[in-house]
Amino acid sequence: RGVVLFCGPYDPTRMDFDSPYGGFMRTVIWSYLGTRDPADPRVADMSLLPHLTSAFPPTFISVGNADPLAPQSYALAEALEAKGVEVDTLFFPPRHEPQLGHEYQLLLSTRDGRLSFERFVAFLAAHSAAPAPAEADAGWRAVRRSPA
């Protein structure tokens, strides 16, 4: 049992809606609430942080160092750790090169994308009820061998 989270908006009340990424986030809240107004009181209901308890499942969180949502992941990891929840993170230093943007985890042709996938698979293996079938392991070995 566990949760895997990649670069999400976990607390919209802490977002800078006037930033270059703010227009996109206004569209996100509009898709859920029918309004683009971040002052709408329902935006606070979208925040995960006030609802965290020590019963939250073990969590793997990863975000790129150039992702506009990176502060959301850092705050969530910190809040989970404060509740005593097992948290495994893959965060990169601010000066890491290449800069890793939103959803870098999907770029398996890159070294950092593969590292994220490897850590993701290891987390799932450690928190799943059953081992992965042999054919899944063989496919993973092929991905790990692909060139950078």
Residue ranges and their predicted role:
Residues 1-148:
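Alpha/beta-hydrolase superfamily serine-hydrolase fold, recognizing
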